[in-house]
């Protein structure tokens, strides 16, 4: 059973969740459709140029259809009548040649800046100021056809943040580093060890490696050897240009607690919301938090909202009191 008690108990002990909880409980938490929502890489990635210079990068996909959201009451009604509403909307738009698109932009942070930034660049609960590091437009992603075979092209797809091309690398973000392994591991369990050979997942360029055998293998490299190092010249060799860049490490290794400012960015978001969206935010929080029976949890969460913005906390407290 889903438990508001457990959800808010966890959040009230995790102030780093405040920014995301504010997004989730606002109108932004329920997009009108997949076409009307932004997308983000969330993690920080690393770019390395031909000269070996390192930059940190954040990816942003901004919808070209504009942001549109649903109020919770209407969303509940739609979910009851058609739980596949979002999938149908996307399918029908593409079928009608109203191809949805997103502008891909990046924020680029020089390596030296990352060493002195006030907010840690590798905390997925924080954003990077677009005033200090403005978005640089890269291109456009357009969805221009629907899957012809849903199983082959959707259910068997294996996206992974660990699929890099030379010049793009993982950052020290610990959550990202965990995902680098977890996604591939899940794919091997779900689709198989040779899922990368399926048409939807296979590379567009020639692949040279020593992988052989395994379940569902259909291109096994004939009698080629499957080990390295070896004495043969015509076998795949490591590309020195694709090696991971070096980086500096200093200090003592250990597990450290850190006191981050979890309130400033949540306050900026709260102040950005129009009055109607603030009202929806307060009502959505009160409807959920008001179900909690443990008053200590409610008090602890309201205290966090108050530390974000006194008005925020006061309005949530008043809304819960009115519905009691």
Regions found by a protein language model. Give the residues of each.
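Active-site-adjacent core segments of small-molecule enzymes
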Residues: 1-324
């Amino acid at each position: 059973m889903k438990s508001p008690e457990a959800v808010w108990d966890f959040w009230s002990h995790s102030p780093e969740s405040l920014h995301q909880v504010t997004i989730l409980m606002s109108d932004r938490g329920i997009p009108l459709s997949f076409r009307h929502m932004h997308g983000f890489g969330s993690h920080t990635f690393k770019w390395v140029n031909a000269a070996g210079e390192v930059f940190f990068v954040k990816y942003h996909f901004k919808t070209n259809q504009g942001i549109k959201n649903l109020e919770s009451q209407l969303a509940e009604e739609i979910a009851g009548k058609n739980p596949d509403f979002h999938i149908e909307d996307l399918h029908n738009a593409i079928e009608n040649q109203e191809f949805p698109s997103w502008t891909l932009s990046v924020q680029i942070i020089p390596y030296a800046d990352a060493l002195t930034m006030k907010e840690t660049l590798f905390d997925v609960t924080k954003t990077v100021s677009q005033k200090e590091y403005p978005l640089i437009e890269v291109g456009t992603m357009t969805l221009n056809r629907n899957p012809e075979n849903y199983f082959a092209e959707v259910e068997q797809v294996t996206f992974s943040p660990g699929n890099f091309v030379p010049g793009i690398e993982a950052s020290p973000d610990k959550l990202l580093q965990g995902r680098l392994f977890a996604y591939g591991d899940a794919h091997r369990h779900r689709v198989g060890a040779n899922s990368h050979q399926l048409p939807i997942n296979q590379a567009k360029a020639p692949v040279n490696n020593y992988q052989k055998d395994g379940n569902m293998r259909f291109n096994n490299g004939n009698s080629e050897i499957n080990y390295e190092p070896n004495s043969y010249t015509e076998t795949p060799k490591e590309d020195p240009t694709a090696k991971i860049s070096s980086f500096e490490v200093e200090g003592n290794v250990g597990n450290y607690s850190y006191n981050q400012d979890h309130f400033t960015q949540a306050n900026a978001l709260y102040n950005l919301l129009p009055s109607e969206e603030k009202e929806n935010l307060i009502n959505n929080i009160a409807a959920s938090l008001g179900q909690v029976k443990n008053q200590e949890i409610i008090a602890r969460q309201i205290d966090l909202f108050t530390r974000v913005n006194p008005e925020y906390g006061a309005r949530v407290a008043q809304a819960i009191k009115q519905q009691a």
